[in-house]
Curated annotation (Swiss-Prot):
SUPFAM superfamilies: P-loop containing nucleoside triphosphate hydrolases. It comes from the Bacteria. The keyword Disulfide bond does not apply. The gene is purA. This is Adenylosuccinate synthetase. It holds the Pfam family Adenylsucc_synt. It is found in: Cytoplasm. Keywords: Cytoplasm, GTP-binding, Ligase, Magnesium, Metal-binding, Nucleotide-binding, Purine biosynthesis. InterPro entries: Adenylosuccin_syn_GTP-bd, Adenylosuccin_syn_Lys_AS, Adenylosuccinate_synth_dom1, Adenylosuccinate_synth_dom2, Adenylosuccinate_synth_dom3, Adenylosuccinate_synthetase, P-loop_NTPase.
């Protein structure tokens, strides 16, 4: 067995797609295990950017299998659009496999997402309005429609009619909104199902067979640990489990078959939407980081909130996700700053704490305790080894590793594949 999990350690947008793409070169199967098209990842190949939301980053390797696992919620309309986009770019998708157990996002999920968010008023969570939460709600309530159901016209008709009856009562009676027509959904979405039918299978069999045969399998997480519904900044979280433990549920692969967990982080922190963010910057330094780092959401286009690197967050992520290796991205974005800061602990009502509180009220009162390091003026985008980094940048990388308590396997000085520097192979000793 040879398997590696890639997880985001912050609030998403850490560069997981880039690292997954990088590690995919030595994998034979690449699988996603949770989330939906609310998460976007950008891959740069030969200077060209590709933006994906559902399909795993490994799709760009035609000889490798890319898997959409059972833990995902799939909007068939978005998936077909993404497939067409790849085809137009000359990318084959013959290597894609979709779990027949994955749940389907339908228009009523998106409408319910919108209405629920509007009803919260000033207490909005900041959802992407992609229907993710309502789809997972239906899954937990055991009324969800799965990919396998979508492919069977009679079953899809029966379950869609049942669900629409219930949802329309909600829309009309609770939200004073307009009902959704069965006819507006049924034929269109059944046709989407037929367009993806060739890719649908029991992906748990594919993944376990690959591992049993000694093949290298890479699991690609979406969002980040701090958006995990159990371990994140609840309720400002996603509706699934991005933590490494989510792999076993979302892929049908047992925990004994997971070998390493790579935590991906940026040299600073960013967040989309509302919720606690102790190291958030509101000054010109924050604006500079946002602009240089192109911190705008892949899915929403919204400006991301940015702040200093938070080792409290990172140690929390390391603990709950069992991180064995770290990939540190976007060090180049900090170039040119006179000083750089790292949050080493929090001050909570005059007491120093080293853990991340569960209470939102406590988090609001947490003040970051910073360690300040000298910056570096040099352009480091051409650096190809740790030794080539300026001394101050090198010290920053080492200090991050010390504070998090995990060795750094790769560091990146730009978005390109060639700008990822290897300190040790993640696939070694497996």
């Amino acid at each position: 067995m040879t398997s590696v999990v890639v997880v985001g350690t912050q609030w998403g947008d850490e560069g997981k797609g880039k690292i997954t793409d990088f590690l995919s070169a030595n994998a034979e199967v690449i699988a996603r295990y949770q989330g939906g098209d609310n998460a976007g990842h950008t891959i740069v190949i030969d200077g060209k950017k590709y933006k994906l939301h559902l399909i795993p980053s490994g799709i760009f390797f035609p000889e490798k299998i890319s898997v959409i696992g059972n833990g995902m919620v799939v909007n068939p309309k978005s998936l077909v659009k993404e497939l067409n986009y790849l085809h137009e770019e000359g990318v084959t998708t013959d290597n894609l496999r979709i779990s027949d157990r994955a749940h389907v996002i339908l228009p009523y999920h998106i409408e319910l997402d919108r209405l629920q968010e509007e009803a919260k008023g000033d207490n909005k969570i900041g959802t992407t309005i992609k229907g993710i939460g309502p789809a997972y709600m239906d899954k937990a309530a055991r009324v969800g429609i799965r990919i396998a159901d979508l492919l069977d016209k009679d079953i899809f008709r029966e379950r869609l009619e049942r669900n629409l009856t219930e949802k329309n009562r909600l829309f009309e009676k609770l939200y004073d909104s307009t009902a959704i027509s069965f006819d507006d959904i049924f034929e269109e979405y059944y046709e989407y199902g037929q367009q993806i039918k060739q890719y649908v299978t029991d992906t748990s069999v594919i993944l376990n067979d690959a591992l049993d045969q000694g093949k290298r399998v890479l699991f690609e997480g979406a969002q980040g640990v701090m958006l995990d519904i159990d371990q994140g900044t609840y309720p400002f979280v996603t509706s699934s489990n991005p933590v490494a433990g989510g792999v076993t549920i979302g892929s049908g692969v047992g925990p004994s078959k997971i070998d390493k967990v790579v935590g991906v982080c940026k040299a600073y922190t960013s967040r989309v939407g509302d919720g606690p963010f102790p190291t958030e910057l509101f000054d010109e330094v924050g604006n500079r980081i946002r602009d240089i780092g192109h911190e705008y959401g892949t899915t929403t286009g919204r400006p991301r909130r940015v702040g200093w690197f938070d080792s409290v967050v990172m140690r929390h992520s390391r603990r709950v996700s069992g991180i064995t290796n770290l990939s540190l991205n976007s060090i180049d974005v900090l170039s040119g700053l006179d000083t750089v800061k790292i949050c080493v602990a929090y001050d909570l009502d005059g007491q120093r704490i080293d853990h991340y509180p569960a209470s939102l009220e406590q988090l609001k009162r947490c003040k970051p305790i910073y360690e300040e390091l000298p910056g570096w003026p040099e352009d480091i985008t051409g650096v190809r080894s740790l030794e080539d980094l300026p001394e101050n940048a090198r010290n920053y990388v080492r200090r991050v590793s010390e504070l998090v308590g995990v060795r750094i396997s790769t560091f990146s000085v730009g978005p390109g594949r060639e700008q990822t520097n290897i300190l040790e192979s993640v696939w070694s000793n497996l």
